[in-house]
Amino acid sequence: NDLNDTYSLLGGAQAWIEFQSKKLDLSRWSRQTILPEVGMDGQKKILNATVAIVGMGGLGCPAGQSLITAGVGKLILIDGDIVELSNLHRQPLHGADDIGKRKVISAKESLEKINSVTAIKIVEDYLDEQNGLDIIRNCDIVIDATDNIDARQLIDRFSKETNVPMIYG
């Protein structure tokens, strides 16, 4: 059909520019939208998803990279830790210039360079009894990328209370 790219000029040039920018945005993920398991409907779900990553270290960094390149609409990064020299060989979102900086700030800066469309919220603290339930209840998925059992059990409990699926590594 030759009319697939036809667009009404109702709204003028501004509407056309907005239409074109959205069209270009979706082309970014064209390699995954051609997969029958994803398609355009699946990509729209990904673009509308909110994912929390608890821990921005050795598991959280690659998880964040994968999610942002897939086109997740909103990421919430939670970690109270600071980047140290010993982190750099296994946490690819942090560089030598980030030593002493909060991991969530460093990760956000790196992820925004990969995809500036995804909204990224940071929580410069560890997930705990006071903040955890409010953070997780507003997510579609929570990823446990922590390195201790107490945090994992807390995330698991909040996940069950809010019916938000938890993924852990």
Label for each model-derived stretch:
Residues 2-5, 13-169:
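Adenine nucleotide-associated cytosolic modules
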